[in-house]
Amino acid sequence: MIDFGNFYSLIAKNHLSHWLETLPAQIANWQREQQHGLFKQWSNAVEFLPEIKPYRLDLLHSVTAESEEPLSAGQIKRIETLMRNLMPWRKGPFSLYGVNIDTEWRSDWKWDRVLPHLSDLTGRTILDVGCGSGYHMWRMIGAGAHLAVGIDPTQLFLCQFEAVRKLLGNDQRAHLLPLGIEQLPALKAFDTVFSMGVLYHRRSPLEHLWQLKDQLVNEGELVLETLVIDGDENTVLVPGDRYAQMRNVYFIPSALALKNWLKKCGFVDIRIADVSVTTTEEQRRTEWMVTESLSDFLDPHDPSKTVEGYPAPKRAVLIARKP
């Protein structure tokens, strides 16, 4: 059973303590009623992983853990087999005692695009909305964050996160909660809030921006990364049934339109930090994610378009401040 007691004890002593008015009951309800049919299998994989304290831990340049003496072939095989029980691995990569998890996404590339534009993360309390397996949270800790809290309702991601955490020596500087942002009270407690790869899945994107703002302290920083299309401040794509084979894509604005949305929600100092086309080198099928990936979602005769005929995925990073 994945235990959230350490997180409750941690926030009981800091400025997130008011969250304890609602959080334990929400988690208890989740544990009682909402578990995926494979959750027991996934949580068993985490339980059977060995307790290891890394001799060398690098979260600044990657997510890498190494032992003082190389593990035996049998130990490595055990870790690899258990981690493969948690496939598909979408966000990473991870290098853990000789087991290299080559994930669908090169999330390190995204981090390299985002990091130069951030305010210094040293000592910050961070919320990562839609955090996936938690890769970027570990990189936030590597960049000096005091505490990274991720929320993502996908239960496989929770188990992947807990597996990595266990292999990082049960590191308590990052925590993942199986919640959506709509389940959070207006905490107004985080120095930096990240929302990366979430906005286009929201039926009401402006409501999502307000929800993000409600989590920030005054003067806090929002880091927003999402799909965009080319165009002026009035350009927004509303896809039909699917976009790049995804059913749950609702609004894809231009970067300039997104800037206006942020302004409408009361953010200031809004800047477009990066715009990049997603390549089939950054998102692809691997041994750790064996089903369809980006190359299958693009027009085989014109990779500048999706199979539905829309512009191929392009992503922007916008940085804004809550006054």
From Swiss-Prot:
The protein's role, per its UniProt record: Catalyzes carboxymethyl transfer from carboxy-S-adenosyl-L-methionine (Cx-SAM) to 5-hydroxyuridine (ho5U) to form 5-carboxymethoxyuridine (cmo5U) at position 34 in tRNAs.
EC number, UniProt record: 2.5.1.-
Subunit structure: Homotetramer.
The organism of origin for this protein: Escherichia coli O157:H7
Annotated family: Belongs to the class I-like SAM-binding methyltransferase superfamily. CmoB family.
A GO MF term: transferase activity, transferring alkyl or aryl (other than methyl) groups
Descriptive protein name: tRNA U34 carboxymethyltransferase
Record-linked SUPFAM superfamilies: S-adenosyl-L-methionine-dependent methyltransferases (SSF53335)
A Gene Ontology BP annotation from the UniProt entry: tRNA wobble uridine modification
PANTHER family recorded: TRANS-ACONITATE 2-METHYLTRANSFERASE-RELATED
Superkingdom to which the source organism belongs: Bacteria
